[in-house]
Amino acid sequence: MISGPNCLRVGQLAPDFSATAVYDQEFKTLKLSDLKNKYIVLFFYPLDFTFVCPTEITAFSDKYNAFSELNTEVLGVSVDSEYSHLAWLQTDRESGGLGDLSYPLVSDLKKEISAAYNVLNSDGVALRGLFIIDPKGIIQYSTINNLEFGRSVEETLRVLQAIQYVQSHPDEVCPANWKPGDKTMNPDPIKSKNYFAAA
């Protein structure tokens, strides 16, 4: 079951969904709106038992604590069934599997979630879409890769930190490549000169 607009843009409300997910070797019903008051990294990947996908999925799991410390939940989604997810989770990493993950994998067998987030390609699989959703359910960041190359977990974490910073410091903006501890700037023609003078 899914509800949401057909055309998604940053700044819009993320489409809600309810679907079966696999977490901790169990099937569970997951509803996006139940994660209110948290940031969400929602990423789509093409298919289970493939090649680039496990490198991304396990990389997000290995960095899960860093996301959790930022009040952020991570969700992976593909058009595979929950049974396929479970089988992949029960395959060790050395054999191309996932092993134990720190976050849920969502089954989008009917392809409704992928369609709502505009990541479904003509072959019926999801492109590598990634969305950062804030605690109010607003999409703050989105990116879509083609199938052949993976995403950077470190860059996702950096963007999340920048989003959280500007939301808690509404009079400041983050320049290119900003990381926590770096200088920010005031979006004002006069005050911004302080940043550029020190750059």
Curated annotation (Swiss-Prot):
Q: Where is the Thioredoxin domain?
A: 8-165
PTM comment text? The Cys-53-SH group is the primary site of oxidation by H(2)O(2), and the oxidized Cys-53 (probably Cys-SOH) rapidly reacts with Cys-174-SH of the other subunit to form an intermolecular disulfide. This disulfide is subsequently reduced by thioredoxin.
What PROSITE patterns does this protein map onto? THIOREDOXIN_2
Q: Name one GO biological process term.
A: hydrogen peroxide catabolic process
Subcellular compartments: Plastid, Chloroplast
The keyword Transcription regulation is assigned to this record: no
CDD domains hit by this protein = PRX_Typ2cys
Under the cellular component aspect of Gene Ontology, which terms does the record hold? chloroplast
Superkingdom as given in the UniProt entry: Eukaryota
Q: What EC number(s) has UniProt assigned to this enzyme? A: 1.11.1.24
**Oxidoreductase in keyword set:** yes
A Pfam family the protein falls into = AhpC-TSA
The EC class name is: oxidoreductase
Keywords linked to the UniProt accession: Antioxidant, Chloroplast, Disulfide bond, Oxidoreductase, Peroxidase, Plastid, Redox-active center
Please give the chief subcellular localization of this protein: plastid
Q: Which GO MF terms does the UniProt record name?
A: thioredoxin peroxidase activity
What the record says about family reads:
Belongs to the peroxiredoxin family. AhpC/Prx1 subfamily.
What is this protein's function per UniProt? Thiol-specific peroxidase that catalyzes the reduction of hydrogen peroxide and organic hydroperoxides to water and alcohols, respectively. Plays a role in cell protection against oxidative stress by detoxifying peroxides.
Instruction: Share what the entry says about its subunit structure, partners included.
Output: Homodimer; disulfide-linked, upon oxidation.
Task: Quote the record's miscellaneous comment.
Answer: The active site is a conserved redox-active cysteine residue, the peroxidatic cysteine (C(P)), which makes the nucleophilic attack on the peroxide substrate. The peroxide oxidizes the C(P)-SH to cysteine sulfenic acid (C(P)-SOH), which then reacts with another cysteine residue, the resolving cysteine (C(R)), to form a disulfide bridge. The disulfide is subsequently reduced by an appropriate electron donor to complete the catalytic cycle. In this typical 2-Cys peroxiredoxin, C(R) is provided by the other dimeric subunit to form an intersubunit disulfide.
Q: What is this protein called?
A: Putative peroxiredoxin ycf42
State the organism named in the record. Answer: Pyropia yezoensis
